[in-house]
Amino acid sequence: MDLKSWILLSCTLLPLSVTSYECYVTPCTRDIIIVVDGSSSMQTSTYVSQEINMITKLTYSWTLDDAKVRLALVGAYLGNEFNGLDYFTDSSLIEKRLQSFRLAAMQYGLFSGDFNTTVRFLDERYVGPRATFGPRANVQKRIIIFSAHKGASDIASTKSKLQEFAQLGYAVTIVGIGVSEDVYKGTFYHKFVSVQWFELGVVAQSIIDTITEDGICFLDQGWTTPKQEICTTSTTTTRAPTTTTTVTTVKGVTGKPATTAKPVPPTHPPFPVGDYQDCSCTTQSLYIDIIFVIDVSEGMGQGGLMMVKAEINTLVGQMSLDPNIQKHVQVGLIKYSDKAEVVFKPSDYTNEDEFTEDLWSDPRLEDVDEKSDEVNLHLGLQQAAKMTASMRNGVRKVIVVYAASYNDEGNDDARQIAANIRETGYAIITVAFVEPESSNLVMKIGEIASPRMNFTSFRDDLLVEQMEDALCQVNCYCPNGWKQLVLENRKYGECFFPTKIDASWTASKFECPVLSKEHTGNGHLVYVNSELKNTFLNQFYMDNWYPENQENPNYDIGYYYDQATKKFIWVNGVTNNPYSNWATGHPDVKQGDCVMAKLLKDSKNDFRWNSVSCTSEYGRGLCQEAACDTDFYCAPSSN
């Protein structure tokens, strides 16, 4: 970003004194509403996630205050409903709110909607005479609507209402995603900003600047520049632009690959796998400790070593090592052949570019050890185990082993120390570098790896995507006391917790958000959308059922009959879930509007759904919450 753009951005969000734009106390004050389009017009939940990334970048450095900038975030059609709370005056709440929107899109999918309903919601909740959350007096007002809607008649039907918004002092900017401005010519707005689908993934600074300068920073007609005063600046730390190296294939490498611009996260947005929510995977938001252990014996060869360095460069270059950023990585590096040596300590680097620069320039990593064709991975893992003790407490740790040779006999056998490391709770990733004509013994190194974390390279392509996924698996876990969904050794972004006292369905419904308040605060009675998940939940509940505490192992689920719509719906708003597991004679709303899973007589873990009273039948609730991952941060003390 050039200096002028940075100054203009800072004007509204980190106020400074600039004569060419509004940098004064009064004009720095705004009431801003941002609408996130979560409808099926966005095509996929991945695009919604990228839309949220753009809004995150737009609002990243904003300093909110009740006397200056206030921000309201509206989720349109996320979870098939509208979410709009009062204006935020605490900047720390922005990311949490946006992440709840992301979770809703990823977990429940997209629902059809229209532009007219979005505008009507804004009128009823924020703009109209009976608005729940009205604006402040004598404050310039802005609405930024992100929209992928394409219905010309639907959009044109909002013209009179948006004209009313303008008359009330609201300047509306439409950020059209994947649509041309011609589609919106039939309505009324202050500014239209066009964003193509591919631009969502790169978040061009020019788009952010246009929204900021033309949609927020400008002075309304009739507002005059007041006496010049320097606005109070924020203490927010903004990360300086960095670069990284991107390599996908290395053949005949002789030096450091060319440096290219750091890719904008997310590198691999989360997406549902089957009936389950996958863990999110934004490499730049990883919060783990990593130790690379590299085989530099003769078997690795110079070409193999160059490939290993290129892969590490690509991975670390996309992470953050800056301790001033909440979600950052610590990295250490050890080399080994017949002996082991620490090359980089975790405390050596707080900048990923410095790490990758030294990765290529440090003389200890320039050549393989041609004097030794022996390997002692046991010593390498010993050094790695010692290094973990110097790293952060409570942070997930992983040891990544790159090996071209392997010895599982005598004192060189690394299997026992690897088992000890895994039992401590640390993960081990192995990458076997195999020459086509060489022995496959090195592929046996996979026996020391954590489940699903053993990989093989035939020295033709890097394994960046597989490695990113494995690192994100390390970064995916549940808050203390919650059970993670794990299928075939694959972790998913869903966590479960049974309430501890008998209570009504209604009481359990309100208890779940309370139990999750230290994490996302979006806990809810469990959503059951497949036979596989139903089986997992039934077994989990039985594993945690104690007859002395609960006579019958029955649990409430997040399903109920809505008297207004005369339909069964889930507490998360889903109405079109095809899966059900009713007991014989159910549902029966005469017995109640809420749903409890009850164990069948003489069965060990076979439950069926029963209609029960929402207030008078008592049982335990089974709560569901998002996992800690690259989207949802858990402090180390929560690990």
Swiss-Prot record:
It comes from Caenorhabditis elegans. Residues 491-618 form the C-type lectin domain. GO terms for cellular component: extracellular region. InterPro entries: C-type_lectin-like, C-type_lectin-like/link_sf, CTDL_fold, VWF_A, vWFA_dom_sf. Pfam families: Lectin_C (PF00059), VWA (PF00092). Its main location: secreted. One of its GO terms (molecular function) is carbohydrate binding. This is C-type lectin domain-containing protein 160. Keywords: Disulfide bond, Lectin, Repeat, Secreted, Signal. CDD domains: CLECT (cd00037), vWFA (cd00198). Residues 1-19 form the signal peptide. Residues 31-178, 289-474 form the VWFA domain. It is found in: Secreted.
